[in-house]
Amino acid sequence: LYCLKKKTLVGGFFMALAVGTKLLPLLLIPFFFRYLGLRNFLKFGLSILGFSVLLWLPFWKGEMLENYTQTIQLWFTTFEFNGSLYNIVRAIGYEVKGYNIIRKLGKVTPFITIGLVLLFSLLNSNRKPQQIFKSMLLLLSCYFFMATTVHPLYLINLIFLGILTGYAFPIVWSLVVFWSYSAYGVG
């Protein structure tokens, strides 16, 4: 929210904390480019980078980057829980290929996500807070629709953005997501 007040240093600090907690906020950074303008966006980006380095420095070891990369790959190519479109693609994969195609699909999904980030940050105006929130909601919705793993807790971001933008579908999604647990029921 500090970015919306164009306080780029403080906004960068809080974004670095968010990224240090979960990588998902990295996807949202480009949405501030048009709103902040080039100069302020560079300040914002450099403050995120600087504060992130300070946050990660105590944990940095030679093999950390490799281990972190492997963890992200594992997330995209191995885990599966409550994935919307993924389940449809997986069923088609079983029908066409005869096996679970998560490893192949997981290698493509990050590129689709990057493409969507560029699409939503460059094609949408994002010059007003309401437009930024709408772009964030659309991107995160697409991301979660494509994801192989979506825990119900992840929908909190969508609910928050849905409230800010007036969209109700995140609330509906959060109400029906618990039906997915029926697939894991006993008997």
Protein language model annotation of sequence segments:
Residues 1-10:
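Membrane-interface transmembrane helices that cradle and orient dolichyl/undecaprenyl
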Residues 9-34, 54, 145-154, 168:
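Transmembrane helices and adjacent periplasmic/lumenal helix-loop junctions
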Residues 44, 128-136, 166-174:
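Membrane-interfacial loop-to-transmembrane alpha-helix junctions, especially the N-terminal start
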Residues 27-50:
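Perimembrane helix-loop-helix junctions
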Residues 50-75, 157:
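Transmembrane-lumen/periplasm boundary regions of multi-pass, lipid-linked membrane glycan transferases
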Residues 168-187:
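Aromatic-enriched
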Residues 14, 26-30, 114-118, 136-143, ...:
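Hydrophobic, membrane-inserted alpha-helices
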Residues 74-149:
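Aromatic/glycine/proline-enriched transmembrane-helix motif characteristic
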